[in-house]
A protein has these predicted regions:
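Compositionally biased terminal segments of proteins
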Residues: 1-48, 53-297
Length: 297
């Protein structure tokens, strides 16, 4: 069989894990946005002012008063509450991980999950790049409430589809500077680019990360930006024909679970678009015959 349905225990544990992870992710987002930076009193001359620091810049919130004292206490008490919530939810995920492994619902390779978490932290994953290829099946099997047969999931790489139309202003500054390769090296320092410029990175274990993008259709227009970072050694996306409709397809967020039993957020194209793309690939004469058979499956 190409897939099997989740049993009752697996389904229940999957849902429970997703709910805890959603609460954890929401708390992390609240901490990063509402309580980012720091807040402190500063004395200037004979007066004391409340200052808020964000992205390395201090800004005055006004002279010390009952109102600014309330702002100060609210900030620090609120941040402490959120940090406590994150700690408790993280501990809960630690408790659930071995159960997830025992029930065999942890599916995604650990290295792939670590890469996705790093790119999510850098705000690259989702708005700028999305997963296509075999690893997307971990999201699709969750959407279907099934587990796909192992041979269909076997892969030693992960493919990222780059949408060059997206602005990099919301990307973490260090990611916009160093690019995809620098973020991969934060996961595993052995990642290096294959070729110069290259669209592929490989680590010491032979795990591959490919960056692809749609080929331009207008020879007159300026070619689209083909790399994320400004670093000269960053990966340069390879242009592939007929990927434009994948970039334009609706995206969906799905929680997968890695082989250690920990959840990871995935952003993938609509499964119907993925299926059509694979069906088209299976008919291409220039496609590797071994890959064509997997595409058709």
């Amino acid at each position: 069989m190409l897939f099997t349905d989740l049993n009752g225990d697996q389904a229940r544990q999957t849902i429970d894990t997703e709910q805890v992870f959603a609460a954890y992710a929401a708390a992390r987002t609240e901490l990063d946005h509402r309580y980012a930076g720091s807040m402190a009193w500063k004395t200037v001359g004979s007066h004391t002012y409340l200052y808020r620091k964000r992205q390395g810049v201090w800004k005055s919130l006004g002279a010390r008063s009952s109102a600014t004292e309330e702002i100060h206490s609210g900030f620090h008490q609120g941040r402490e509450r959120v940090q406590d919530r994150i700690t408790n939810l993280a501990a809960r995920l630690d408790e659930m991980a071995p159960v997830n492994r025992a029930l065999r619902i942890g599916r995604m390779p650990i290295i792939a999950a670590r890469v996705l978490r790093r790119l999510t932290e850098a705000r690259l994953y989702g708005p700028v790049v999305g997963v296509v290829g075999t690893n997307a099946l971990y999201a699709y099997e969750r959407l279907g409430g099934v587990q796909i047969a192992g041979p269909q999931l076997a892969t030693g790489d992960i493919d990222f589809l780059y949408d060059a139309r997206k602005s990099l202003r919301l990307v973490a500054p260090e990611a916009a500077a160093g690019g995809l390769l620098a973020e991969l090296q934060k996961v595993d320092r052995s990642f290096t680019a294959v070729g110069n410029p290259g669209f592929r990175a490989v680590n010491r274990d032979g795990y591959l990360v490919d960056l692809i993008m749609p080929a331009g259709t207008d020879p007159i227009r300026r070619p689209p930006r083909n790399r994320i970072g400004s670093a000269a050694d960053d990966l340069q996306a390879v242009e592939i024909e007929r990927l434009g409709w994948l970039v334009n397809s609706p995206k969906t967020a799905v929680t997968a679970i890695d082989a250690r039993g920990y959840p990871v957020q995935m952003w993938v194209i609509d499964p119907r678009a993925f299926a059509l793309h694979k069906a088209w690939l299976s008919t291409r004469g220039d496609r590797d015959p071994l890959k064509r058979s997997r595409d058709a499956a």
